[in-house]
Amino acid sequence: MPREIKEVKDFLNKARRSDARAVKIKKNPTNTKFKIRCSRFLYTLVVQDKEKADKIKQSLPPGLQVKEVK
């Protein structure tokens, strides 16, 4: 089941969890979507600002698998 997250802090906390497996980053002309696969849910964060999206991408944990989908 997918769940949408509105806050960046909540998203980064979910990314640091032990059951977080992978992050998919989908870039559109208007927004960027970050999708974290955890054991039970798929969490999604939608960001309109491209600079903010780059900062979030740099803030992801280094052990997490990151895949960019275009």
Swiss-Prot record:
Family: Belongs to the eukaryotic ribosomal protein eL38 family.
Name recorded for this polypeptide: Large ribosomal subunit protein eL38
Species of provenance: Drosophila melanogaster (Fruit fly)
Keyword terms: Ribonucleoprotein, Ribosomal protein
InterPro entries (alphabetical): Ribosomal_eL38, Ribosomal_eL38_sf
Highest taxon listed in the record's lineage: Eukaryota
Gene name for this UniProt entry: RpL38
Pfam families assigned to the protein according to its UniProt record, in alphabetical order: Ribosomal_L38e
GO molecular-function terms, A-Z: structural constituent of ribosome
Any one of the GO BP annotations: protein-RNA complex assembly
Gene Ontology annotations for the cellular component aspect, listed alphabetically: cytosolic large ribosomal subunit; cytosolic ribosome
